[in-house]
Design a protein with these regions (language model features):
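N-terminal transmembrane alpha-helices
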Residues: 8-40, 44-45, 58-73, 77, ...
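Short runs within selected transmembrane alpha-helices of multi-pass transporters and secretion channels
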Residues: 71, 140-158, 166-174, 199-213, ...
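Structural signal for membrane-spanning alpha-helices in multi-pass inner-membrane proteins
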Residues: 112, 155, 181, 185, ...
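Helix-terminus/linker motif at the lipid-water interface of multi-pass membrane proteins
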Residues: 29, 33-51, 120-127, 183-194, ...
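Short alpha-helical transmembrane segments in multi-pass integral membrane proteins
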Residues: 1-21, 78-145, 191-247, 303-368, ...
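Hydrophobic transmembrane alpha-helices of multi-pass small-molecule transporters
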Residues: 62-65, 177-182, 211-215, 287-290, ...
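Transmembrane helical elements of multi-pass membrane transporters/channels
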Residues: 19-38, 139, 173, 206-210, ...
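Small-residue-rich hydrophobic transmembrane alpha-helices
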Residues: 50-110, 147-166, 277-335, 339-341, ...
Length: 466
């Protein structure tokens, strides 16, 4: 068994989680920087350009959702096989990332190219921003296959206990995007000023470079995997298992996208200034949210490995440490955002109307981010335990079943401020619900001794050779 994978079951938990989390957090922050950097430079084009990016953002979240979900399914399955000592099955599962990434990426490209206008109408685009949003949507979707591959390949490599190479993929792409943005958006030097098209093109080029780095790692024998041609051939049963386990992560992201679609439609009644304000607030908050995703990415293979090895005590210790650590970090980050909200918003826009709307949106939205963190950890835990239905329910509850109704209710009662307040209100309710689920599962497993007697999930055995 690869040494890195063995460490998931033997290395001291604090140092292991820190070693896995730091590169993973760096990688997810780098991913988030695509949108943040685009917004920073696009803000020079006016608030309508920012609003166009805000409208397209939910579609981008859906693309990321599929990549994150597929990656989570691969990670849970592969780390569990490592825990059981079945390296051949781990390689077989890993080989499916190529087919899955290509299929999902091409699907999103086709949808954006063929149905841009109805998609934008559904996302709440106002007439004055539709053309800019259409250009940005179509061009960025050309990079969808590369983006999905980066996310899935990164999760696969991370499942073997290697968090550094996924970080390199993400950061390389992000740095390239930051370098290209001013040249292509503003037309520096020999480059033409492409405006919002330049922002989209810079993102696509950067994503393609990140994907090429991932290909080099996987096919150049730079990881713990030894993927052969027989592993790459699509395996319908194995693909179904990956999708089943990864669906909660996708749903968690997709419901966030659907929630923002509803949010955008509510805010569109207040004009493009309100859309620009939420675009800025969400991108700034999204950057703060990325460490949560990074830590959950680190936790999932630890849970999966120790579940496969039957080490229940270590599994729950990892969950507890992850929750405490990320909640403390988010509490400190909340203070920074609350104190420096005007300065943070000022990085994106100097329009007085937009700033006046975005500052309270950011402050109110960030008030409860420390309560979001454990909910995401709990979803990752249930994924690692192959409890897909429970993870799916929690993912649906967080954004869709609670947040969306509160947005409509609070906006009706208190207007624009009510829409902002719906965010921390829903986060608080969901924390209470998700904690009840995870505590019940913990007590049940302690009482039944399932960690000693657990049997492999029969549904997730299709990657075995017969």
């Amino acid at each position: 068994m690869p040494d890195r994978a063995e460490q998931l079951g033997s290395a001291p938990l604090p140092s292991l989680l820190l070693r896995l989390s730091v590169p993973s957090v760096a990688a997810t922050v780098a991913t988030s920087l695509y949108n943040v950097v685009d917004t920073l430079f696009v803000s020079w084009l006016g608030h309508q350009a920012i609003a166009a990016l805000a409208v397209v953002f939910p579609y981008q979240i859906i693309v990321i959702a599929v990549g994150v979900g597929t990656g989570a399914g691969v990670s849970a399955l592969v780390s569990r096989r490592f825990g059981e000592g079945d390296i051949e099955a781990a390689n077989h599962a890993g080989g499916q990332v190529f087919f899955l990434s290509a299929c999902w990426g091409v699907l999103f490209l086709f949808l954006a190219a063929g149905f841009a206008e109805p998609i934008l109408a559904a996302l709440g685009a106002t007439p004055d921003i539709t053309e800019q949003a259409r250009l940005y949507l179509i061009i960025t979707s050309c990079g969808a296959p590369a983006l999905v591959f980066i996310l899935v390949a990164g999760s696969l490599i991370r499942a073997s206990g290697d968090a550094v190479r996924p970080m390199v993929m993400m950061i390389a792409a992000s740095v390239l995007n930051m370098v290209l943005d001013p040249f292509l958006i503003l037309g520096i030097g020999p480059f033409p000023a492409l405006g919002i098209r330049g922002a989209a093109l810079a993102t696509v080029v950067a994503q393609c470079i990140g994907a090429l780095i991932g290909l080099y790692y996987l096919l150049g024998l730079r990881t713990s995997f030894r993927i052969r041609s027989s592993h790459v051939r699509p395996d319908p049963r194995l693909i179904a298992d990956i999708c089943r386990v990864g669906m909660p992560a996708s749903v968690q992201e997709v419901t966030e996208s659907l929630a923002f679609i509803c949010f955008n439609r509510v805010l569109s009644g207040y004009g493009s200034v309100a859309l620009a304000a939420i675009g800025i607030a969400m991108r700034a908050a999204d950057l703060a949210f990325m460490p949560i995703i990074g830590v959950s990415n680190a936790l999932l293979p630890v849970v999966g490995y120790n579940f496969g090895a039957g080490n229940e005590k270590r599994l729950w210790s990892a969950v507890r440490l992850s929750c405490i650590g990320i909640m403390a970090a988010m509490a400190m980050l909340t203070v920074v955002y609350e104190v420096f909200a005007p300065q943070i918003v000022g990085l994106f826009s100097h329009d007085s109307e937009v700033v006046a709307a975005a500052v309270p949106a950011l402050r109110i939205g960030m008030a409860s981010i420390a309560l979001i963190a454990p909910n995401v950890m709990f979803v990752a835990t249930f994924q690692g335990l192959s409890m897909g239905k429970t993870a799916l329910l929690l993912a649906l509850t967080r954004q869709f079943l609670v947040f969306v109704p509160l947005v409509y209710l609070f906006e009706h009662l208190w207007g624009l401020t009510g829409a902002w307040v719906a965010m921390p209100a829903s986060d608080t309710l969901v924390f209470i619900i998700s904690f009840g689920f995870i505590y019940r599962q913990y007590r049940l497993r302690q009482q039944t001794g399932v960690g000693v007697t657990h049997q492999p999930d029969p549904v997730a055995r299709s990657d075995r050779k017969t």
